[in-house]
Every structure is written in C-alpha cells, then in structure tokens.
C-alpha cells in the first residue's frame, strides 16, 4: 500500500493526540502539550513515514520514530524562541511569553528527553544505527544554531559558511528523518544513504526558498510582512550574495540602507535593499539555487532501487516545499 501525504499526516496527528503529556508536575508538561497542539506542517515525521513506505507497508515502528523527531524538532523551536525573544510561534504566544523563561528552558529540556524515550520504543534490528543517526543529527542542529547566533555579530560571513550553517541547522534533520525511516523499512545501506543525501538537498532548497520569500513573497500569501530579514540584519543568502556582488556606488548605497533606523525608515530600508537585490539579480541567483538543489534531491530519488510509483508521494512533497509560496 502506498500512503498519500494526507493519510500519513492523519497518522502523525493521531499519534501526537494519543501521546498526550498531561502529567505531573503540570508546570513541566503543560508547555509541552501546548507546543505540540499548535500544529505545523509535520514535515519531518511525514518524511520518516514516506521513507519507510518506500520499502514496506508496515509503518508501526516508523510512526514511533517520526513522533520522536517531531518532539525533538519542537524542542529546538521552543529554545530558539527564547534565544530570539520571539513573541509568537504559529500565531500563538511562545512558551516563554505565556509562562516564563525558566519554564520554557526546563520544558524544552524535558522535550529532548521525551524524544529519546520515544525513539527507544522503536523495535528494529538496526536500532543502534538509528540511534547513532539521531544523536549525530541532534548534535549538528545545536552546532548550526550556534553558528547562526555567531553570524549575527559578524560582518565577514561568506556564502560557503552560510550554506554550511543551514545544512546543520535545517537540512540534517530532514536527512535524518528520511534515513531513519528507510532503515526501519529495511532499506539497503546504499539506499538509506542516498535518501540522507536527498534530505540534505531538500533542506537546502527549502531554506533558500524561505530566504527568497522573505523578500519577494506575496505578503497576503506568505502570511507575514516581507523584509523581516532585512530589518533584523539576518545573514541570509540574498544579503550575503548582494554584499559579495555589490561594488562602487551600489556597495555604498547598500551599506547606507542597511544602516538606516528601522523605526523611522522601515519602508525605505526594505524597498531600497530589495531594489538592489533585483539590480544585482540576487533574486534570480537564489531561485536558481533553489532549483539546483531540488534537481539534486530528485536525482537522489531516481537512484533508489524502488518502484517509480512508490516515489511519487515523496517527490510531490519535495516539489511542494521547494516551490511553496508561504
């Protein structure tokens, strides 16, 4: 049986509901319950299930692993929100705003432990390999977050450094999801590694698309105002490309725009920087990279020893993520 994306999403949501964290002390677990109730795309557990379904119809153990990865992912978001001092997540108050910083830190710690407890319930002859992939990935995600924070204080960040940072912060968890699903499903080592590489390329394409949409997305579709990265001086692909390409008067103009005060020159700053992006064809450059990594991900899938029809749900998801409008 080949499961559709909607069928897999239903399985994931049912698993989350059945694993409610209504325990004592309530102050520790209520924030976990809250975070997991806020929804989201559930991309990572869906990838675990899709990868497993390439090789088997039995998704029982993959669902456990998918839930573990989703809990881990939300743990990273919870702690990211503290570091970013974010007010909202998915339209709702963040945990540290609804409760407080100490509660958010401790509940986040508990979520990380819960993720490992859930993973430990997976029955597989390849569990040691599954655990190794998960643990290595968790370590890499932390490294990616640290690099991201360090980049905020640096003015000499290069594109290669940025690509490595987003590989660690974003792409490796997607790759981990695919590989763990494949291992549970009985994939060969070669196929499992190919799916891991697919996840890396998928993740890079996803993050570059996110960078693009922040400046060139339709606010009505994107769901938020454009230019957020510009206002906060985030080292994204667009800005780093512009800083690399800008020369002479264009470089001076870009530097002047970036130095403008957000409160008094918000629109001038956003529109001016976006105009320079267009002048330097940074938007086209970013779109080309999104397409290039999408193609690499698709090429990875075509190398699998799997019937073509089983690949369709995964291919459709990857295309949708790379071409999304929000």
Predicted regions and their residues:
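Mobile late-domain/C-terminal helix-loop "cap" segments
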Residues: 251-301
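Hydrophobic, well-ordered secondary-structure elements that form the walls
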Residues: 239, 297, 314
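Amphipathic alpha-helices that form helix-helix packing interfaces
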Residues: 12, 205, 297-300, 317, ...
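Short, amphipathic C-terminal "tail helix"
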Residues: 293, 305-326
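An amphipathic alpha-helix signature
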Residues: 13, 17, 49, 175, ...
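A short structural micro-motif
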Residues: 137-140, 201-202, 260-264, 279, ...
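Mg2+-dependent prenyl diphosphate-binding active-site environment of isoprenoid biosynthetic enzymes
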Residues: 7, 17, 21-251, 319
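N-terminal leader/targeting segments and the immediately adjacent pre-domain N-terminus
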Residues: 1-16
């Amino acid at each position: 049986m080949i499961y559709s994306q909607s069928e897999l999403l239903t399985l994931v949501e049912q698993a989350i509901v059945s694993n409610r964290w209504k325990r004592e002390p309530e102050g520790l677990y209520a924030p976990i319950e809250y975070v997991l109730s806020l929804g989201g795309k559930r991309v990572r557990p869906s990838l675990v299930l899709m990868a497993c379904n390439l090789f088997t119809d039995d998704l029982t153990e993959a669902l456990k692993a998918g839930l573990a990865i989703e809990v881990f992912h939300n743990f990273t978001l919870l702690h990211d929100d503290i570091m970013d001092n974010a007010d909202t997540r998915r339209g709702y108050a963040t945990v540290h705003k609804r409760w407080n910083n100490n509660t958010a830190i401790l509940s986040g710690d508990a979520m990380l432990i819960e993720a490992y407890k859930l993973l430990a319930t997976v029955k597989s002859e390849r569990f040691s390999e599954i655990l190794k992939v998960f643990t290595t990935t968790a370590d890499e995600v932390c490294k990616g977050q640290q690099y991201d924070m360090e980049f905020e204080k640096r003015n000499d960040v290069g594109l290669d450094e940025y690509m490595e940072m987003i590989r660690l912060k974003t792409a490796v968890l997607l790759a981990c999801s695919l590989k763990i699903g494949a291992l549970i499903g009985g994939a060969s080592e070669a196929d499992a590694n190919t799916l891991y590489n697919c996840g890396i390329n998928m993740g890079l394409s996803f993050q570059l698309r996110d960078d693009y949409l922040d400046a060139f997305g339709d606010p009505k579709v994107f769901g938020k105002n454009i230019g957020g990265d510009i206002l906060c001086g985030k080292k994204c692909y667009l800005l780093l490309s512009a800083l690399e390409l800008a020369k002479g008067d264009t470089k001076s103009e870009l530097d002047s725009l970036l130095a403008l005060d957000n409160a008094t020159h918000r629109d001038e700053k956003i529109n001016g920087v976006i105009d320079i992006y267009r002048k330097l064809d940074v938007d086209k450059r970013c779109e080309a990279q999104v397409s290039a990594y999408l193609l690499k991900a698709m090429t990875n899938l075509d190398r699998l020893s799997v019937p073509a029809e089983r690949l369709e749900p995964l291919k459709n998801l990857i295309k949708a993520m790379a071409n999304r409008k929000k």
